[in-house]
Amino acid sequence: MVASIEDAAEYGERADALVSGLLGRVMRQRRTVAAALDYIRALSRETRANCWELAAAAGHKGPYRMQALLGRRRWSWEKARDALPGLAQDVLPDDPGDLIGPGLAFDETAHLKKGKSTACASPQHAGVTGKVENCVTWVFAALVTTLGQAWADFDVYMPDCWAKDAARRAKAGIPEDLAFATKPELAIAQAKRLVKAGLRVLWAAADEVYGRSGEFRAALRALSLAYVVIIPCDYRVTLAEGRTVRADEAIAGAVFERRSCGNGTKGPRYGGWALIATADPRESLLIRRLDRAENKYTFYLCWAPEDRPATMTYFITIAGRRWPVETTFRTGKDALAWDQSQARTYDAICRHTALTALAQLRTAAIQGALAGAGVLPAAPAASQDTQGTPDETTVNPDDLAIYTGTAPLPAVGGQPCPPGIRPIGLSAAETSRIERLARDWKAGILTTVRLAFQLRWSAWRRRHQARARWHHYSTRLAAPAT
């Protein structure tokens, strides 16, 4: 199948209409819906997720609408999160011919931070670097089907040091009634929310952070979700004959079969697999031996309800569907700049994540439509407040001017900032950016209107930096010498 660029544009408009309809049920004001849709579409471009760059990508004259969207505008990110399962099921429909059907993959990922002011940021293990980092950790539940994967639910993990510090919580806007919860407890809450919301899922997969939790596995059983969860090698398992052993001690009596758990980027993911019965007739110990690495093993606890086959093939297939949650993290970080947000308060970081989840589903909808695997409803006529084009389309000669002067510094501390302060001088990075714009404009890649828009943004950024520098210098010069 071959799709045209016109198809891509049409599917983008249809996906916008789908997301806009959802936003309209979450947000009361049309301008908030329009700003949120602009935010989501801007995330889909190659840009950093700070309000300045998102606003420029969306065609706004300044960052104020984006800042208000994450801050003072009245809307509930929790309602937006609750709407994710319905949209996810529409975008990633079930394949009737799939052996295991749709399921959930749980995992956590870190959003690295420099300072200590961001809500829930603290030194903790970050899987992205493999060491302790100052970061915010999130727990995600991804809907996984044969058509793709996307975030269906999320929670921010609040470390114990934050949970016990009332003053710090209040400053970051963390609700007083939000209690500390472990990562498995957050995943349990997500599974319950998703099943209650009517999302059709049949299984769950997770790594050892969740697999070692008996409460997590019990919750999945109560929800009739088959599971394949990783456990550590020293986890004790009671075998069918009644003997309790470490998981790695069961290797001695295991008979391995070479099978594939799915296709990867380099072909089928083969490995040696062995299924060992446990004292629970519906639960088994699954062992994977990495291909060409005889001393590397992964251990799983597997369970299936009575109406599903508790076979090796069934469990291996589920085990292979855990990896797509990592794909959602790569999409969120690499394609949608989720981890580059400069939001700090609790509501702001959760709003940004909710909007990123919608951006991920929007992308999945377009991807499925282009591949011929999904159907998007026809989009209504676009309104003026959701076009995402530059606010001004007229070009004056001054709009193409490049301000190269340097803003003045305050001679005396405490002086007010001049109302018409000049921008700061051109940095090397800004010079390179402007030269690239000029080159694209001369080659006909960039229109004059878009060039003028980008130059206005350049002047705005540097004038804003000049005002900030003025206030910093003025404050320091006014401070008494020590």
Regions found by a protein language model. Name each.
Residues I287-W303, R321-L336:
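A glycine-rich, aromatic-flanked flexible loop/lid motif
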